[in-house]
Design a protein with these regions (language model features):
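Secretory targeting and sorting signals
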Residues: 1-23
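Right-handed parallel beta-helix
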Residues: 170-180, 194-207, 228, 234-251, ...
Length: 547
């Protein structure tokens, strides 16, 4: 953990009004870097930043005492820092910094877990191969699995849960150090909690070693897995920000087909269920996953009515199949999202209007693969309404609810309305600017802290090397030796970002066509390559203002 002692925050410049995180008053946490750098562990959700700002706001572990501030680089350390087995009911303010790659499967494997579970009536340990052979519908029939092998699968699944599932309690902030903070193979469950912040971490591949076969799920059966990368259950005031969610080394495209169905080892990337409320999901990147982000666990949970109030904004969804999000019961604000397809792949729909839901969608950008009908963006799951405005598909305005309604019968149509009008939000950016802003800002590694050595005037640097000088972070554009970072011209580019991760314009920053930058409190998008040309300095130039 020695590297953690040299952490330098690169969060500088003017905060965007659309999502201004603020420091916790009265708490230590300003980094020694100066220049307005802020300790991400002490930041709290801005006062108007979505539903998470209601109900008293979301401050996470910002009030943590020094003894409850941890830097972790192993799965065991992370679990202990969160409170271990007692985390679910723990309310101690905590800040947990994730340093580097943490693998919940380090030192174990699916096979090793299975080997601990014998099949009743034999000395043979459980294996999924035996399970598949035993319950093949061609020989076993289309009935639920039962008997010693199913019992052993359930026991193996329970054993896995003790190893790779970790609860997160109340008043907690989990934040990644630098650009390489990653949690692999684990499922973090924020359950029965209040006031939780998760930022700047890549969550990958929360795989289920022992998915269950359900022949009655759908027309052809399905394999169902138990783990989300991050899940929010029966919790309130949660902020998930600037994180990346994916399937890691086991993307959906790599899964085999068993019994004619994908052998699904993942559930959701970020599911919010069981009456959770007042959640903001901002500047995240979701990619290469099927069932991505469901909001609400069951149509039958009528006790969830009036809850599931969630804001999604400035998130990036790349090659996801469905549920982006799918909503039950909630009043959900979805704005300035970027949906992009590099291939049609597993795509089914993006917005799912579920029972008693009310989605208010504005200024979202879609980049669909060739031949994908915009009418497929919306799907109805017993919902009655979905308000949408300002959407573009491949750069052109499209009435998405109108397109959906034109593609279905009258009984399945949606009213283009919401039962409320959002008031808790920052600036809603124009749709044309969304791709540049989101691509520049969303995902882990876009915020500090940044681990980097101090600039040495006697050292030799190559293109891409990162250093710290006078409290700022710089990257070499080409070979450098003896050239001081910060000069108006030279090899060094300053890597300042605002608190949402949007780059701050500096005279040394290289800006390329389509890049978004912040300057004088406004966001600007570059028309072409530039360096040293100040946004707004002339009536015509490389930048146009977003807001």
């Amino acid at each position: 953990l020695a590297a953690a002692t040299a952490v330098v925050m690169a969060v500088t410049g003017t905060a965007l009004t659309s999502s201004a995180a603020t420091g916790a008053a009265g708490e230590e946490g300003t980094s020694p870097g100066g220049r307005g750098a802020v300790d991400l562990g002490r930041q709290v959700l801005g006062a108007d930043d979505g539903w998470g700002a209601a109900n008293g706001g979301t401050t996470g572990g910002s009030a943590a005492s020094a003894e409850h501030v941890s830097v972790v680089d192993t799965w065991d350390e992370l679990r202990a820092a969160l409170g271990g087995a007692g985390a679910r009911t723990d309310t101690t303010p905590r800040i947990v910094y994730v340093d580097g790659r943490i693998d919940a499967f380090a030192g174990t494997s699916c096979e090793a877990i299975a080997a601990t579970v014998p099949v009743a009536g034999s000395d043979v340990p459980f294996s999924m191969d035996d399970y598949v052979a035993a319950y093949d519908p061609a020989t076993y029939g289309w009935v639920d699995p039962a008997g010693p092998l199913e019992d052993a699968r359930a026991a193996a699944a329970a054993e896995q849960a003790t190893r790779t599932l970790q609860h997160v309690g109340s008043n907690v902030t989990i934040v990644g150090l630098g650009a390489d903070a990653q949690v692999v193979g684990a499922s973090l469950r924020i359950r029965d909690a209040r006031n939780v912040i998760v930022r700047n971490v890549t969550f990958s591949d929360a795989r289920d070693c022992f998915p269950a076969w359900d022949p009655g799920d759908g027309d052809a059966g399905n394999w169902n897995s138990a783990y989300d990368n991050v899940s929010v259950w029966t919790s309130e005031n949660v902020w998930v920000d600037h994180s990346t969610f994916d399937d890691g080394e086991h993307p959906h495209s790599s899964l085999p087909t068993v019994f004619g169905r994908p052998f699904e080892i993942h559930d959701g990337l970020l599911d919010i269920t069981h009456g959770s409320d007042h959640v903001t999901v901002s500047y995240n990147h979701f990619s290469d996953h099927d069932k991505t982000a469901i909001l609400g666990s069951s149509d039958s949970r009528t006790q969830d009515a009036g809850k599931h109030k969630v804001t999604y904004h400035h998130n990036r969804w790349t090659d996801v199949g469905q549920r982006a999000p799918r909503v039950r019961f909630g009043d959900v604000h979805v704005y300035n999202e970027l949906y992009e397809q590099t291939r049609e792949g597993i795509f089914q729909y993006y917005w799912g209007a579920g029972v008693d839901s009310s989605i208010y969608a504005e200024n979202n950008a879609f980049e669909l693969a060739a031949g994908v009908d915009p009418a497929r963006i919306v799907a109805r799951w017993k919902g009655e309404r979905l308000f949408e405005t300002g959407s573009t598909v491949n750069g052109e305005p499209v009435d998405l609810v109108g397109a959906y309604n034109a593609s279905v019968g009258e009984a399945d149509r949606l009213a283009d309305e919401a039962r409320w009008t959002p008031t808790l939000h920052g600036t809603v950016d124009p749709t044309w600017a969304v791709p540049a802003i989101v691509r520049s800002s969303a995902g882990a590694g876009r915020l500090g802290p940044v681990d980097a050595p101090a600039y040495d005037p006697h050292a030799t640097y190559g293109a891409g090397d990162v250093v710290v000088h006078d409290g700022a972070v710089f990257r070499a554009q080409w070979y450098a030796r003896g050239a001081t970072p910060g000069a108006a011209w030279g090899p060094w580019e300053e890597l300042a970002t605002n608190e949402q991760g949007v780059p701050v314009w500096t005279p040394t920053r290289v800006v390329r066509a389509g890049d978004a930058v912040v300057h004088d409190g406004a966001v600007w998008v570059a028309r072409w390559w530039s360096r040293g040309q100040e946004p707004g300095a002339a009536s015509w130039g490389p930048f146009r203002a977003v807001g």
